Design a protein with these regions (language model features):
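Primarily recognizes Gram-negative and organellar outer-membrane beta-barrels
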Residues: 1-320
Length: 320
């Protein structure tokens, strides 16, 4: 019995602040000026564990098992302040930021197009567990063996996005001037698949082997995206739930589920000699997929069946 493995832990914390002052030429006679600051704080924590177990109960049998586990947690925050002007503000971004609460005291109001203040938080968890196994058994005669290979993978992830945005259009009427858009988006995702392959190899003459193989795979993926419009006085720190709930935005919410059934059966002949090699066979691949999709008034199910037939022939000869 042989065992081995590794465990890795990683933590990243990035704090980035960027400032910009730009001019965009709208036409040959007019320009648009923009000053902005972006502040981002991104944190990532991850844990990965891999193991390998090999067991040989006798000289004819080999068993290998490779389990693995991964966990990742993200926390990404950003704050953006941008200011757009019809004339050169003639002030630095820092000076404009300092006067943001009373910007017209620094720059004539007729030169201010709009100001945008936006804060966002995206946090998520991703848990993955999977593994593979292989069992090989030699059956007496050299070259005769049977092999089983299996794999499994399961992923469960969730993502939450919180955002508050306030845009002030200085040149609009008092009723139209302020635009507030607060949103909460939840996106849980579930993926899992498993597969199994059986292979049998039979020697039929010197250097020649006949091989039979069958493979089956099942995959399923489900994702729900729910978008909520939150009240104007809502703040990110309040979170979502309890008294802090919003109105479901059906046009921007959707759910999708994919299901796959894949089969593959192979028959092949391999003949290997000192100066030549021959590989000929045929593969049959029936497949079925199903999609269930919902968005707003759309609720649909699509099923697809495919059958692939693939013959192969490969002959090589060494002349020297």
């Amino acid at each position: 019995l042989e065992t081995g493995g590794s465990v890795n832990y990683n933590y990243k914390d990035a704090d980035i602040i960027s400032k910009q002052a730009s001019e965009t030429f709208v036409s040959s006679a007019t320009s648009s000026f923009k000053n902005a600051q972006n502040a981002n704080r991104n944190k990532t924590t991850s844990l990965t564990a891999d193991f390998r177990i090999e067991w040989k109960p006798d000289t004819m049998t080999t068993v290998i098992f490779r389990p693995r586990l991964t966990y990742v947690k993200n926390d990404n925050r950003s704050a953006t302040n941008s200011f757009t002007f019809s004339q050169d503000p003639e002030h630095t971004t820092d000076e404009i930021l300092s006067a943001a609460d009373n910007l017209s005291s620094l720059i004539p109001e007729e030169n201010i197009v709009n100001t945008i203040a936006r804060n966002s938080l995206q946090k998520g968890d991703n848990f993955n567990v999977g593994g593979s196994a292989m069992v090989n058994r030699r059956l007496g005669k050299p070259g005769r063996n049977i092999t089983f290979r299996g794999s499994y993978n399961y992923t469960n992830s969730s993502s939450e996005q919180f955002s508050v945005s306030e845009t002030d259009y200085y040149q609009k009427t008092e009723e139209e001037r302020l635009e507030i858009l607060n949103r909460y988006i939840s996106t849980p995702t579930l993926n899992y698949n498993y597969g199994a392959r059986f292979t049998y190899s039979e020697p039929i003459f010197k250097g020649g082997f006949l091989q039979f193989s069958y493979y089956f795979q099942y995959k399923r993926s489900k994702s729900d995206n729910s978008t909520y419009t939150m009240p104007n006085d809502w703040e990110i720190a309040q979170g979502y739930g309890g008294d802090n709930v919003g109105v479901l935005d059906e046009k921007n919410s959707k759910s999708a589920q994919y299901t796959y059934y894949n089969h593959q059966a192979d028959v092949s002949l391999r003949w290997i000699r000192e100066k030549m090699s021959l590989n000929a066979g045929v593969s049959f691949q029936p497949q079925k997929s199903k999609l269930s999709y919902k968005k707003d008034q759309l609720d649909t199910v699509a099923v697809r069946n495919v059958f692939n037939f693939t013959p192969t022939f490969d002959f090589r000869y060494k002349f020297s």
